[in-house]
Amino acid sequence: MAAGRVFAFRDARWAPDPVLAPSAAVRSPQPVPLVIDNGSFQTRAGWAAADPSVPAEPLLRFRSLAARSRGARGGAGAETQVGNDLGSPEPLRWLLRSPFDRNVPVQLELQELLFDHVFQRLGVASQGCVDHPIVLTEAVCNPLYSRQMMSELLFECYQVPKVSYGVDSLYSFYHNRRQNWPCSGLVISSGYQCTHILPVLEGRLDAKNCKRINLGGCQAAVYLQRLLQLKYPGHFAAITLSRMEEILHEHSYIAEDYTEELQKWRSPEYYENNVHKMQLPFSNKLLGSTLTSEEKQERRQQQLRRLQELNARRREEKLQLDQERLDRLLYVQELLEDGQMDQFHKALVELNMDSAEELQSYINKLSLAIEQTKQKILQAEVNIEVDIVDSKPETPDLDPLSSEQSLEDVESINEFEPLFAEEQPEAEKPVAAVQPVFNLAEYHQLFLGTERIRAPEIIFQPSLIGEDQTGIAETMQYVLERYSKEQQALLVQNVFLTGGNAMYPGLKARVQKELLEMRPFQSSFQVHLASSPTLDAWYGARDWAVEHMTREEGWITRKDYEEKGGEYLKEHCASNVYVPIRLPKQAPRTTEALAPSRALAAGTGNPCEQA
């Protein structure tokens, strides 16, 4: 197998975002809009200004995550980290929190932490408020309650002058427009949590016919993690979600024909040429693998000294306990000699003994054991350190007590450290012995074969993970069938792919193949890929903000918020469709309906007053 097919995990740590100093063009002649792509995977923020001195790139890019440590008891020392300040997500995985449920923000206290991070790192200098207009992305067909809470947060907490909401994939479509705007097309947006099929007619979203698939990059990462953990149970803990996301981003691809691609992987030659080996981190210095004979000898002697000290400590503790028990038994024997029979018999019962003979026998045995323990302690103090490497000493040890102690130490060492059980040092082993070669690095490698296509395939075949949903191809066909033939032909001339999953190699070819199968014979269609699938949403929002900076179209002012409610939305070319809440009106109560109730009230008055 080619060595170039071995890839090491980068395990890159996130660098904390610096506090940026905005240029003067951001505030003069008036505050420019602040564009925030509020994605469930990543938050991107930057300025929208026509001045060339202001970067036309998102200045902040961080994961939409926050972690709050508990600190000491009472909350003292608690710390909150947001985005790139986390460093690495794996050690804090159990503490990570996201404001999103799927792709809809529902935890507004966590959303406030993300906004605080954005405003603080971008250097917003206004006191007590954010005096910049905000352009914010939201989910397709965002629930009114979610928009109401978001508007309340922006207007009440940050005192923003105005805000505009738009859909990220429609902003990307707006940024990549290839015809004179407004234009029509079919937008396929596949992100971290969801995949959407969005028909756009004459520059406006047709919300009645848009469809959502509850699968995205998050589910693909979890599926890939389960596949590899089942394949390599020995590396269960090393197969983390962060590494699975790295595999998806850099080593996965979409098969143009999934079944045919699986057949290719059955060929050993194809497998050898296309498998990717992911190298897990490991340590070469294993026990006994790289130690020299001198290091092994020194290690043995250190362990021997520690075990001798441990045995000596145990003997001293045993001697102390035996001595205390012997003193108690001698005290009971003195009661017998003094004639205190009642106390003597009571003490025998407490000691679980039956007679004075049994007491005397136990005293003799305990005295002998104490004497032997004292001799062992004295012998250990004067004994020379035993060389356990030399298994055949020149002169035999004639002292049985010393021999017993040495054997006890050696057995303890062999149980404690497998290194001590070796027969001979390396220098004394026969030269002809051939040691088997074991590639430790290969043992810590993950071989990616069909897994490279199985994980991304779930957006086309959700049944792979047990989801009862249709994939992109079936959903796209279902949406197209809801239009007339003329409108279908118009939509398929501009099929637009965007979102993080559009980065998979082969996605465009797969969509073209699916369209070729479902469209009439010899009909034409065109599939376009976003120039930057992950960043075009921010670029499109910036384009819209620069073009509509001085207009009223699409901007919700504070007056609109106070008069029409937090769920109010001003529509524009990249926004959702606003569907206001229509509460049923109560019918007014007529005088005819009130007459019977008045008569009933008069008839059931106070009986005392009637009398």
Curated annotation (Swiss-Prot):
Keywords, ordered alphabetically: Coiled coil, DNA damage, DNA recombination, DNA repair, Nucleus, Transcription, Transcription regulation
Stretches of the chain forming a coiled coil according to its record: 290-329, 355-386
Principal location class: nucleus
GO aspect biological process, one term: regulation of DNA-templated transcription
Record bears the keyword Nucleus: yes
CDD domains (UniProt xref): ASKHA_NBD_Arp5
Subcellular location as annotated: Nucleus
Function: Proposed core component of the chromatin remodeling INO80 complex which is involved in transcriptional regulation, DNA replication and probably DNA repair.
Alphabetized PANTHER family for the sequence: ACTIN
Subunit structure: Component of the chromatin remodeling INO80 complex.
Protein's UniProt name: Actin-related protein 5
UniProt source species: Gallus gallus (Chicken)
Lineage: Eukaryota, Metazoa, Chordata, Craniata, Vertebrata
